[in-house]
Amino acid sequence: MHSSRRDAFHPVNGQPLASLSMTPKGFTVTTAPWYDDAREAASKRPVAERPTTYETGQRIAQFIAGPWLHAEHVEAVVSTGVQGVVFHGTGLGHLPIDDPQNDAPENALLWRILTRCVNRELPVVIVNQCIHGPVDMNVYSKGRKQQAMGLLGHGVSSTPEAMTAKLHWVLSQNINVKEALSSNLCGEHRETLRE
């Protein structure tokens, strides 16, 4: 991934969807067989002039985990009535929620606000800041603590943008968020993504 090179559009955690061949007479697009199969298996829907499967009033907040992530910021945004929160976790999907040496009280405050969010049934989803690899909350105790808190995202290997769009769609359909986020709706959770 690069901001200005021609290979800036390599797929993340996946294989190319298609290849493009250009000649002086024009170009041809050859889609990958697995993508053709996925397109055939996808549900058909009519083309519309405005969104029909997304509730346009849904609001999803996003935060990036790091030393600047503070509970009062999360609380202020959550108080505006968002329908979901996506956190870009570090490494395997961790958030700064522990204070083992009693020198990071802001982490304990973040843990409290996240617990309140989950208790209010506000979906809190962890995605990965890393370009490659899944969120794996089973490796370290912090990840297991996050799962026990009710934070979602274990096993997610899609990009933050794809997961945010998926959360928006799931909330718009009024279906079970936890089940839908762990399911494969359109190829975002293919096993090959976890390599």
Describe the residue ranges of each PLM region.
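Accessory alpha-helical/coil subdomains and C-terminal extensions
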Residues: 1-97, 188-195
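C-terminal non-catalytic interaction/assembly regions of soluble proteins
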Residues: 76, 89-195
